[in-house]
Curated annotation (Swiss-Prot):
<keyword id="KW-0480">Metal-thiolate cluster</keyword>
<dbReference type="Pfam" id="PF01439">
    <property type="entry name" value="Metallothio_2"/>
</dbReference>
<dbReference type="InterPro" id="IPR000347">
    <property type="entry name" value="Metalthion_15p"/>
</dbReference>
<keyword id="KW-0479">Metal-binding</keyword>
<comment type="similarity">
    <text>Belongs to the metallothionein superfamily. Type 15 family.</text>
</comment>
<comment type="function">
    <text>Metallothioneins have a high content of cysteine residues that bind various heavy metals.</text>
</comment>
<dbReference type="GO" id="GO:0046872">
    <property type="term" value="F:metal ion binding"/>
</dbReference>
<protein>
    <recommendedName>
        <fullName>Metallothionein-like protein 2</fullName>
    </recommendedName>
</protein>
């Protein structure tokens, strides 16, 4: 997870989340717990499931944080 200005990580939909409290170059093995609520409504027609993504971005192939807590380049999916 990348850091912007040492206080936030690049989240989903190219928006910055609160993924980290500071830029640490070494591996940080601290425990983080998050909950995700999923609601699936099934009807008579075709079913469509929608899942909310967690606010995390990968360094390669995901978001990279630029200046002022903005994502650069914006390549989130």
């Amino acid at each position: 997870m990348s850091c912007c200005g040492g206080n936030c990580g690049c989240g989903s939909a190219c928006k910055c989340g609160n993924g980290c409290g500071g830029c640490k170059m070494n591996a940080d093995l601290s425990y983080t717990e998050s909950t995700t609520t999923e609601t699936i409504v099934m009807g008579v027609g075709s079913a469509k499931a929608q899942f909310e993504g967690a606010e995390m971005g990968a360094e390669s192939g995901g978001c990279k944080c630029g200046a002022n807590c903005t994502c650069d380049p914006c390549t989130c999916k």
